[in-house]
């Protein structure tokens, strides 16, 4: 026959071209069968899988081929023209006859392979050496091809489609690869019920990301292999289809549909033995629909309706609404199973079930308190993700972190190594010196080195011993897990003798060894006075460290109990916010109630309306609160409400609605809280905002949440809401001057508030706190605080100043103004003190002075 491209499939023709390149590469004049076989086992996946199915070794075939090729005559240079050898011509003719006997339209890889197995030049001997003859090849090819015929030039992509584009979950469950599934019995039972229907037997699992949709399918796979399912699902194969792999590389129109049809044909021809699982099932809508081609969902619909294809889908609530609900014909073919987020108690049970898998993988122990902390803290602090996924991630990362510490050099030993290197460098430097002082230093360094090296040796030995103990425990746990898998397999195969031998012999022995080793380590640790270099148990502290990294919450704030942390809050605030004891006490009391769990947990930690004249400490209280509770003044989100005087400006706070410019950017408030959920939010001069803008405050104050422009819930439960206002400030100043009682001032201001704010707004606040006007005594304390800040800045410059009471009284007198509060103090210090100091610093550079005494002479600050 003529060798024409039209007679071959794409892959078989590619192999012949590669054979030509092989012949050229070896400087051979003729293209022969050995070149073709080499190209098949080098480049072609189908040829490799056929040989592997025949239990042949690719490496051995390559070795024998190379030996044969080396002994063939070759030219000195690469030949320009090549000729087809008689054996190759005969093999191609033979493959054409095999094609006709198979009733195929094109010569494909398997035809070439069968023809090569009959080649008398070398291929037959090489394949026979691996116990591969034409009969064995035919049997293996029949298994791979099934009933498919070669009707186009790309048939190889349709062979074993499920193996290529799917993952056998029942096989993975049998091998113990899948994690155990704890709980979720109702959801699995409902899924089995739907799968057992006659028609429309296709469940779709709908739930938020991370609630365990895929885990339910894995749980079903485990039930199938354990026989814990109705007869309709006994011995079925559960295969997860990879839509990404199915679409990837389908460059020609219709290629994707061909692949999908091959998969569906394989599923339907199994007579219900295969159940298909499509994760992210919304991807089938529109998949492959380019240039007018039909999408995947339209190929699935008829088979789903007739019950020929049993398919489990999984998707999120949003994706289901956006993609599947738009296609009612597809939606009605699936029966919905809603998967809700598990409770904290259920999550702890799930974590306890998974604990062993993670212990074996990481080679560490995980304490039960760590599991409880992971569930509770992830639910409290990680608001945008769902249980149990976020809790499992916490355990995984904490265990990974500890494993990394175990394999790395301990910090104590690393410090000693660095000190030794430093002393050795000093020793080399001192050896060049010959004076007596250098010799004494050298002797001291030698003594220090000897001491450090002795300590280094001891710590190294201890580290190796501890590491070895942990590795031994890890190895024993892995062995126990392997034996448990073997026991399960033996029970499934009803090999009860083998199961009993493993369970009461091997497993018992390993468990005893593990217990003895753990007891020995515990005794050694208790007897040993030395502190351990390595930890092998994940504790609650490890969980809090990981959460601190994820959410930027200061670590110490989680490790301390809420009560301990807040006991001295009032004193600390009073030291920074002067003259407002009632206000500070009200704020501290409210936060203490919130943090000790006595107030409503669904509301913000505290919500306060601070009223009073300018400069009395309203904003300062917010900053101080942020610093004390969250370790940084940057944890304060400041929203200036004078910028929100128009009704439409609400979109700047929560984000523009869909279709408007700025929708993707999000809102100033919503995005700030999403990024920093643990912060003090200051709404400054709240009375200046439009009343409609204030309406969004109602749900924040009442329920601790806000829905932004994108429809996402923003959690305000861990924020402190502070609103400041100048309402009633004139009355406060006037009545303070008349020395009225605080209660009377409070009553007057509260009555004025009703003219500015709606009752439903005022009623939702924890406290309405009225700040008094500052007295002269308060101003003196503020002066001292401001002077301390100046001193701290001067200390960096290497300068010191001393002030007597006269200077403090003078600054307080000059800055005293009941209307403006403490703000003039800052200006007085700036103009009268800092300006002169700046000039003195410039002079001191030439005079080399570093200490100044301040005094008041002739109503002026003087430096001595």
UniProtKB/Swiss-Prot annotation:
Signal peptide: none annotated. Residues 84-147 are annotated as: Repeat 2. It is found in: Cytoplasm. ATP 2 binds at residues 612-619. ATP 1 binds at residues 207-214. Residues 160-341 are annotated as: NBD1. The keyword Oxidoreductase does not apply. Residues 8-72 are annotated as: Repeat 1. Keywords: ATP-binding, Chaperone, Coiled coil, Cytoplasm, Nucleotide-binding, Repeat, Stress response. Part of a stress-induced multi-chaperone system, it is involved in the recovery of the cell from heat-induced damage, in cooperation with DnaK, DnaJ and GrpE. Acts before DnaK, in the processing of protein aggregates. Protein binding stimulates the ATPase activity; ATP hydrolysis unfolds the denatured protein aggregates, which probably helps expose new hydrophobic binding sites on the surface of ClpB-bound aggregates, contributing to the solubilization and refolding of denatured protein aggregates by DnaK. This is Chaperone protein ClpB. It comes from Prochlorococcus marinus (strain SARG / CCMP1375 / SS120).
């Amino acid at each position: 026959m003529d060798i024409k491209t039209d007679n071959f499939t794409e892959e078989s023709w590619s192999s012949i071209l590669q054979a030509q390149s092989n012949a050229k590469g070896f400087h051979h004049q003729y293209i022969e069968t050995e070149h073709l076989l080499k190209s098949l086992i080098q480049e072609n996946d189908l040829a490799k899988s056929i040989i592997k199915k025949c239990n042949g070794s690719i490496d051995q075939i390559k070795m024998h081929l190379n030996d044969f090729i080396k002994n063939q005559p070759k030219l000195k240079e690469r030949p320009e023209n090549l000729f087809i050898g008689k054996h190759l011509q005969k093999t191609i003719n033979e493959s054409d006859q095999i094609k006709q006997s198979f009733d195929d339209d094109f010569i494909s890889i398997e035809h070439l392979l069968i023809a090569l197995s009959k080649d008398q030049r070398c291929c037959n001997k090489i394949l026979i050496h691996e116990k591969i003859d034409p009969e064995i090849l035919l049997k293996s090819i029949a298994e791979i091809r099934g009933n498919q015929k070669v009707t186009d030039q790309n048939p190889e992509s349709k062979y074993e489609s499920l193996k290529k584009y799917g993952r056998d979950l029942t096989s993975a469950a049998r091998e113990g690869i899948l994690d155990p599934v704890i709980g979720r019995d109702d959801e699995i039972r409902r899924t089995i019920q739907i799968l057992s229907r006659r028609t429309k037997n296709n469940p779709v699992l709908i739930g938020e990301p991370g609630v365990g949709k895929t885990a339910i399918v894995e749980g079903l796979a485990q039930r199938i292999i354990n026989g814990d399912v109705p007869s309709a699902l006994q011995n079925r194969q559960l295969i997860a289809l990879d839509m990404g792999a199915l679409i990837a590389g389908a460059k020609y129109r219709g290629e994707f549909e061909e692949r999908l049809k091959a998969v569906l044909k394989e599923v339907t021809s199994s007579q219900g033995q295969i159940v298909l699982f499509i994760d992210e099932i919304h991807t089938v809508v529109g998949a492959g629909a380019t240039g007018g081609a039909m999408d995947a969902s339209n190929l699935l619909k008829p088979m789903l309706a007739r019950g020929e294809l049993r398919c489990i889908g999984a998707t999120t609530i949003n994706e289901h609404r956006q993609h599947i609900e738009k296609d009612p014909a597809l939606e009605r073919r699936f029966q919905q199973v809603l998967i809700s987020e598990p409770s904290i108690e259920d999550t702890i049970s799930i974590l306890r079930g998974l604990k062993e898998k993670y212990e074996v993988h990481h080679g560490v122990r995980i304490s039960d308190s760590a599991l409880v902390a992971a569930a509770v803290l992830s639910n409290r602090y990680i608001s945008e993700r769902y249980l149990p996924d976020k809790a499992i991630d916490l355990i995984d990362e904490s265990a990974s972190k500890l494993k990394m510490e175990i394999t790395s050099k301990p910090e104590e030993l690393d410090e000693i190594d660095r000190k030794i290197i430093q002393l050795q460098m000093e020793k080399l430097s001192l050896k060049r010196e010959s004076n007596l002082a250098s010799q004494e230093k050298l002797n001291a360094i030698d003594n220090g080195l000897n001491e450090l090296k002795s300590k280094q040796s001891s710590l190294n030995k201890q580290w190796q011993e501890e590491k070895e103990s942990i590795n031994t425990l890890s190895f024993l746990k892995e062995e126990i897990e392997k034996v448990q898998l073997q026991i399960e397999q033996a029970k499934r195969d009803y090999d009860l003798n083998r199961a009993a031998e493993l369970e009461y012999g091997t497993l018992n022995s390993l468990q005893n060894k593990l217990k003895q080793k753990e007891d020995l380590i515990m005794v050694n640790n208790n007897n040993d006075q030395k502190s351990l270099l390595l930890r092998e148990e994940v504790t609650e502290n490890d969980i809090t460290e990981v959460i601190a990294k994820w959410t930027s919450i200061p670590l110490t704030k989680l490790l301390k109990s809420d009560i301990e942390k807040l006991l001295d809050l009032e004193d600390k605030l009073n030291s920074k916010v002067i003259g407002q004891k009632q206000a500070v006490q009200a704020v501290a009391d409210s936060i203490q109630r919130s943090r000790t769990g006595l107030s409503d947990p669904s509301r913000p930690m505290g919500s306060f309306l601070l009223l009073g004249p300018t400069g009395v400490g309203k904003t300062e209280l917010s900053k101080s609160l942020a610093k004390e509770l969250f370790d940084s003044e940057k944890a304060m989100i400041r929203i200036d409400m004078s910028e929100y005087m128009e009704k439409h400006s609400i979109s700047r706070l929560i984000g523009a609605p869909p279709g408007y410019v700025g929708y993707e950017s999000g809102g100033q408030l919503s995005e700030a809280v999403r990024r920093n959920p643990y912060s003090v939010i200051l709404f400054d001069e709240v009375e200046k905002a439009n009343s409609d803008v204030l309406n969004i405050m109602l749900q924040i104050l009442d329920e601790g949440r806000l829905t932004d422009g994108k429809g996402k819930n923003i959690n305000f439960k861990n924020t402190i809401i502070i609103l400041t206002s100048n309402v009633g400030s004139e009355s406060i100043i006037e009545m303070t001057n008349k020395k009225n009682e605080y209660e009377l001032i409070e009553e007057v201001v509260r009555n004025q508030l009703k003219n500015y704010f709606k009752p439903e707004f005022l009623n939702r606040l924890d406290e309405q706190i009225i700040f008094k006007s500052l007295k002269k005594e308060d101003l003196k304390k503020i002066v001292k605080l401001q002077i301390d800040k100046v001193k701290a800045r001067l200390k960096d410059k290497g300068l010191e100043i001393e002030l007597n009471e006269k200077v403090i009284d003078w600054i307080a007198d000059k800055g005293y103004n009941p209307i403006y509060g403490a703000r003039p103090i800052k200006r007085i210090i700036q103009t009268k003190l800092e300006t002169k100091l700046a000039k003195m610093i410039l002079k001191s550079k030439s005079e080399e002075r570093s200490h100044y005494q301040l005094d008041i002479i002739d109503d002026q600050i003087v430096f001595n």
